[in-house]
């Protein structure tokens, strides 16, 4: 199950313990919102931000102008925070009952076939033609956006796929699976390229470097791994933060990774990790993690989306 990482209160000691103000978080722009947004995503290309509110409304902001659009999807149930993806033309969302909706930037909605499973993760290919879906009960799936049909499903020994991404060239799909393996597939036909062994505990998320050569993988072990994308071989590991990591994002410009850390007992946000991969130390940003509702990147580097109030968001650059 993908965890909501921003709606529950935390003790101050949990939030700021081990935080090291070694990096700078600079406000980039403010976004007004007509409803309280609980999850956000930086769209592929970094020009827009999409968000989801508790009435299942889909918000879209242009970062250059701050202009907001609000779309309705008529989905049958709540949208999991991880079941949101967008690029320069399309927003994809999925409900906990398995409904998938595609919304273009003019608000036209098209629904895909019902998956009948809780959707916990989504990612669009760089060209926007393919959608990969992770559910709570099954391996990764790849769907064709134009036809709305599923092209293939992956496989696991047991368990589901927790997180998946498509390579920048659109040729490979990488999945972190509940049976502790990291798997790579040929995006065209779903053929398994490799199943690389992981740690004793399951990985939750994967991010792909801008050149497609390196993966950042993290999960229940509480550390971030760099892996060679061609083989799955571990290249380097960060130190452990002592808590599970549920999301990772690699910078497209410098060797750094952002990580969402949850408290292992409460599964509430416990920190935003920052790893300079030239070292082994996984540090934490000196910010309140319960304000973070999304992370991603643009052409210049890593970005956070934070909730300043129910009516205002802040997009901030991590330097």
Regions of interest found by a model, annotated:
Residues 1-5:
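Positively charged n-region of N-terminal signal peptides that target proteins for export
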Residues 20-319:
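WD40-repeat beta-propeller superdomains and closely related acidic/aromatic-rich repeat-like regions
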């Amino acid at each position: 199950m993908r965890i909501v990482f921003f709606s529950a209160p935390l003790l101050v000691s949990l939030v700021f313990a081990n935080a090291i103000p070694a990096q700078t978080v600079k406000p980039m722009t403010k976004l007004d919102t007509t409803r309280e947004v609980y999850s956000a995503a930086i769209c592929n290309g970094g020009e827009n931000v999409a968000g989801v509110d508790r009435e299942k409304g889909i918000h879209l902001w242009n970062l250059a102008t701050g202009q907001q659009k609000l779309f309705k999807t008529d989905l049958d149930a709540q949208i999991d925070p991880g079941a949101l993806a967008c690029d320069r033309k399309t927003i994809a969302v999925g409900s906990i009952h398995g409904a998938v909706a595609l919304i273009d930037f003019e608000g036209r909605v098209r629904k895909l076939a019902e998956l009948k499973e809780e959707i916990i993760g989504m990612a669009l290919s760089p060209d926007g033609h393919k959608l990969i879906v992770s559910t709570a009960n099954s391996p990764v799936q790849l769907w064709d956006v134009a036809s709305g049909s599923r092209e293939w499903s992956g496989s696991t020994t047991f368990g589901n796929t927790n997180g998946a991404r498509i390579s920048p060239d659109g040729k490979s799909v990488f999945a972190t699976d509940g049976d502790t393996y990291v798997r790579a597939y040929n995006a065209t036909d779903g053929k398994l390229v490799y199943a690389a062994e992981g740690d004793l505990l399951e990985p939750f998320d994967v991010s792909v470097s801008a050149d497609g050569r390196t993966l950042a993988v993290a999960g229940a072990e509480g550390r971030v791994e760099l892996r060679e994308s061609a083989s799955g071989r571990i290249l380097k590991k960060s130190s452990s933060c002592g808590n599970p990591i549920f999301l990772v994002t690699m910078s497209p410009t410098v060797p750094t990774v952002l990580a969402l850390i949850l408290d292992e007992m409460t599964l509430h946000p416990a920190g935003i990790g920052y790893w300079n991969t030239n070292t082994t130390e996984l540090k934490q940003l000196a910010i309140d993690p319960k304000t973070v509702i999304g992370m991603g990147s643009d052409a210049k580097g890593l970005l956070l989306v934070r909730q300043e109030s129910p009516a205002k968001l802040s997009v901030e650059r991590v330097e």
